[in-house]
UniProtKB/Swiss-Prot annotation:
It comes from Rhizobium meliloti (strain 1021) (Ensifer meliloti). The active site is at 162 (for beta-ketoacyl synthase activity), 294 (for beta-ketoacyl synthase activity), 331 (for beta-ketoacyl synthase activity). Proposed to synthesize NOD factor fatty acyl chain. Involved in the synthesis of a highly unsaturated fatty acid moiety, which forms part of a lipo-oligosaccharide that is responsible for host specificity. The gene is nodE. This is Nodulation protein E. One of its GO terms (molecular function) is 3-oxoacyl-[acyl-carrier-protein] synthase activity. Belongs to the thiolase-like superfamily. Beta-ketoacyl-ACP synthases family. One of its GO terms (cellular component) is plasma membrane. The keyword Iron does not apply.
Length: 402
């Protein structure tokens, strides 16, 4: 069954803001949310920057449900409710079996895991908090979204590190195309700003000491952030039948694996995923106006991605617009490509390419137009989003104007 899949609602929160309007406002302007961490439970960890959600917005999550939720689930549920409101949809007994959710989570509920560790091994406790297990499981965010909204169709978690959200969106597209659902909530959530995760990334020598500078000479690494992004996906027929406002079409999906190294990037994997995405969408390389790059700010990743883009797009690589919005919201792991989906869809909606913030000076190995520091007005009919994870799991999406 070849059904077109469209986006009719989006929700999100991250260091930039607690709804899609504020996220896009500051993303578009190139304002960075990266700064010193204010979390009081980092147990003496100093000198690490990140992008925090400093205060949660008001929400109507049931208190009985809230006690069983880790931060990743809370973020996902808040974003999911916003997406449903924008889409003008609600779930009821008549349609619940045709509504589902796929939520990408790169790390899981490490806040609950760390608290259990400290209770047992530091404080000398004998038992963990009762909901530790269900808070920490990678599928928790998807389950909590399902329960909060009453979704009874296909519901599952997706985990593939930094490409989790794009994989979740791709999986949701498949559910609709295969006829298993009419509506899917899809995206990602992660909350990595906890002591144990930050220490693990510090040990890999991957963290930047100051800020995230994708594609800029002198870039020093990744900055972690927390957040969530969710989209309402519908079959085109379902959306038009109810008179929905269509924000964009998910035109293509490209998936691949490097099969190379657990941390080091390879060119062939990202290249294959981008080529597969173009083929799935029926697009030529020249059709892409804007590419939201994976762009983590590490020397190896940004150079590798630049090479892959040149291989796929040829001369057009130098004329299309590219940017990495991780420079504004940081690397939110499982939520990263969900937030970048918001960037792509809004670029299509408003004809503005968000910039790569914090850019200082050109790197001759990253010589493409990465929209440094200043947004650019441009007609965007097709936008592509790259997500390339540690372990070499790659997921690329193409979004198209409808």
């Amino acid at each position: 069954m070849d059904r077109r899949v469209v986006i009719t609602g989006m929700g999100g929160l991250c260091g930039l803001g607690t709804d899609t309007t504020s996220i896009w406002k500051w993303m578009r302007e190139g304002r960075s949310a990266i700064g010193p961490l204010l979390n009081t439970e980092l147990h003496g960890l100093k000198g690490i920057v990140g992008a925090e959600v400093k205060a949660l917005p008001d929400h109507n999550i049931d208190r009985k449900q809230l006690v069983s939720m880790d931060r990743i689930s809370v973020l996902a549920v808040i974003a999911a409710h916003e997406a449903m409101r924008q889409a003008g949809l609600s779930c009821n007994e008549g349609n619940a079996l045709r509504f589902g959710a796929t939520v990408g989570v790169g790390l899981g509920g490490w806040d609950a895991t760390e608290k259990a560790y400290r209770t047992l091994l530091v404080d000398g406790g004998t038992r963990t908090e009762i909901f530790t297990g269900v808070k920490a499981m990678p599928s928790a965010a998807a389950c909590q979204v399902s329960m909060s909204l009453g979704l009874r169709g296909p519901v599952f978690g997706v985990t593939s590190a930094c490409s989790s959200a794009n994989h979740a969106i791709a999986s949701a597209v498949d559910q609709i195309k295969c006829g298993r659902a009419d509506v899917m909530l899809a995206g990602g959530s992660d909350a990595p700003l906890v002591w144990i995760v930050l220490k693990a990334w510090e040990a890999m020598r991957a963290l930047a000491p100051d800020t995230c500078r994708p594609f800029s000479a002198g870039r020093k690494g990744v900055v972690l952030g927390e957040g969530a992004g969710m989209a309402v996906l519908e079959s085109y027929e379902h959306a038009t039948a109810r008179g929905a406002t269509i924000l964009a079409e998910v035109a293509g999906v490209g998936l691949s694996a490097d099969a190379f190294h657990i941390t080091a990037p390879a060119v062939h994997g990202p290249e294959s995923a981008m080529r597969a995405c173009l083929a799935d969408a029926g697009l030529n390389a020249e059709d892409v106006d804007y590419l939201n790059a994976h762009g983590t700010g590490t020397k190896a990743n940004d150079q590798n991605e630049t090479t892959a883009i040149k291989r796929v797009f040829g001369d057009h690589a130098y004329s299309m617009s590219i940017s990495s919005t991780k420079s504004t919201h940081a690397h939110c792991i499982g939520a990263a490509s969900a937030l970048e989906m918001i960037a792509c869809v809004m670029a299509i909606q408003e004809g503005v390419v968000p910039p790569t913030a914090n850019y200082r000076e050109p790197d001759p190995d990253c010589d493409l137009d990465v929209t440094p520091n200043v947004p650019r007005e441009r007609k965007v009919r097709v936008a592509m989003s790259n997500a390339f994870a540690m372990g070499g799991t790659n997921a690329v999406l193409a979004f198209k104007q409808v």
